Each structure stands twice: as structure tokens, then as C-alpha cells.
């Protein structure tokens, strides 16, 4: 069973429906972060296959949290996840049997990637988060947060596993569906690239502040 799947979404809810329909392997908790605030998302309870998904959460946000913040929020909300977190793009989908295949290659000690680009379907092991912290939220709203995290992980000796599971992805469909987002991305992408280069100019960036082990040790909910 997959402990946690996290899917942020901003638009193209039709692709989210396709993504959900492709989940054909047991999942303990599914978290959908609705950064677009669309009422149509509330149709998701009827789209979730309750034979596969034990529990789900739909969080509708008043503004776009961005990718890194969405992932971090989900990790913070599920600190007891057994082996880690499966981070899935809303415009990605699994071929039959691919989710089981992918999960079988995941480990608490690794980052496991599938699809193209690899971070369209990524599993981040809990020991990886315990070692290097969360994603840098200054990369907003998208791009370079994954490059930065993967590079930090490699600098700390974390193995990167490239899965052979068949995961499909309509790359950049969020931006392609809205000219205003494409224009905004032209600005934010450049700014995020500059931040990435600045963060790595003098070696490995500092550890992100939030600490998984401390959260679990001091928590009142376990």
C-alpha cells in the first residue's frame, strides 16, 4: 500500500480526473491541494476509487501556494507516513499496474523518479526528508524546487532511483492551457533560475528549518 499520494492542481481538472482514474493500487491517504479554488473539484469524491483509496483530503486554497509549498504542507500534515511521500503531477497518469511497479521500487532512503521529466512522479523517502529537510519555498510558484532538492539530496549521499514504471505526463499542461500563466512563468522562471544559481554559488545550501524527527518526537498527536 502507498502511504501518501500528494497531487497539487491549479487548472485542467479534466487531467486530474484522468490521473485519479489511473490509480489502481491501494493508497492509504490521498491529498489533493486545489490551488485553483475551482468548485468543480468537489466532484472528486465521486472520482476517487474507494476500493483503492482508504482516505482522501481535498484542500482548497485561497491562492496558489506553488509546488514547493504544496508538497511541504502535505509532508508536514502526514509526518508519520511509513516510508515517504509520492508526489504526483495532476497531468500525469499511470499505465495499468504501473503504480504497484513504481511503489515496489521506492524506499525510505531514496528518491525514486518516473516519467518525463522525472519529477512528474516522484517518491521522496522519509529518511531523505529527515536528512535534508523540506523543499525550498522561495522557488515560487514552480520550477527549480525539484532540481534544488535533488541536488541537495545527492550532496548528502542520497541515491536517486530511476524507475522503469510506465508513467505518462502531459508536460507543462498547466501553463499551456492559459496564456496569462505562460506570460507570468516567463518572469518567475527566470527569477527562480537566478535564485537556484545564487543558492549553489558557494556550495551546498543550508538545511531547511523544519525538522521531521523533531516534529515526530514532540508531537501531541501520537
Q: Which positions does each model-derived feature cover?
A:
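Conserved donor-nucleotide/metal-binding helix-loop-beta segment in metal-dependent transferases, i.e.
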Residues: 97-114
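A conserved hydrophobic helix/loop-capping motif in glycosyltransferases and polysaccharide synthases
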Residues: 3-15, 19, 33
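C-terminal catalytic/acceptor-binding lobe
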Residues: 145-222
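Glycine-rich, basic loop-to-helix element that forms the pyrophosphate-binding segment
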Residues: 61-78
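Aromatic-glycine-rich donor-binding/catalytic loop that engages nucleotide-sugar donors
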Residues: 124-143, 152-163
